[in-house]
Amino acid sequence: MLSWALIFFIIAIIAAAFGFGGIAVAAAGIAKILFFLFLVMFVIFLIMGLIGRRGPPPV
């Protein structure tokens, strides 16, 4: 049990170093760009799917 506490403590120290070091700001900027990129791609593929959809197959 003490080993798990030590592992999580080390992970917390590493996360704090990244968070307080300014890396989080850069990662948030990249995440915003990726969000809008994938949102635009979703809308494009949605429109393509609605336009290109054919009727039901013949029986």
UniProtKB/Swiss-Prot annotation:
The keyword Transmembrane applies. It is a multi-pass membrane protein. It is found in: Cell membrane. Coiled coil: none annotated. Signal peptide: none annotated. This is UPF0391 membrane protein lpl2443. It comes from Legionella pneumophila (strain Lens). GO terms for cellular component: plasma membrane. The chain crosses the membrane at residues 5-25, 30-50. Its main location: membrane. Keywords: Cell membrane, Membrane, Transmembrane, Transmembrane helix. Belongs to the UPF0391 family. It comes from the Bacteria.
